Amino acid sequence: MTCMNPRGHGALRAFAHPTGSAFVIVVAATIAAHVAALAQNLDIKRYNPSEWTKGRFSEVVTVTGAGKTIYLAGVGAEDENAPAGASAPIRHLGNPYEQCRYAYDKIKRLLATHGASLADAVKQVVYVTDVRFQADVAKCRREAYGDGPIPANTFLVINALAIPGMLLEIDVTAVVAK
């Protein structure tokens, strides 16, 4: 159906209902109310299991609504047992494969704390400081996921990470049923 624009030209095409613009307003209001209701039913929580990260960033963010979405901050080989306010020492200096294994061990523990596993991961981003680490990271990732589902993945080579000695960092997003 052709709808006239304010100048009387019939150039705009849109869905129109016999009752006219009142119907469009009702539909728009219904959609807005539904979106507002969904937003009110979301519960967003932030967690910092490692003392040294408190006040710096959230290590894990969960969003619960129809399901629960879990967002992990970049996980690397930072020692999670470092004291609050300190820069965490890096484990396995100079060894991208071992840093990756350590990162996935931490990721598994963080996800488990929130009722998830790597099988629930839907997206991950891997940051490395040298493209030559790709083979080590690919091997480590295959070992971490095993025969389970593999999430959408982005692999990025960057100049540096937040703490000297970090060779890689992995962001993971997972979704679990409520």
Regions found by a protein language model. Give the residues of each.
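N-terminal presequence-like segments and the immediate start of the first folded domain
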Residues: F23-D105, R109-K123, T129-K178
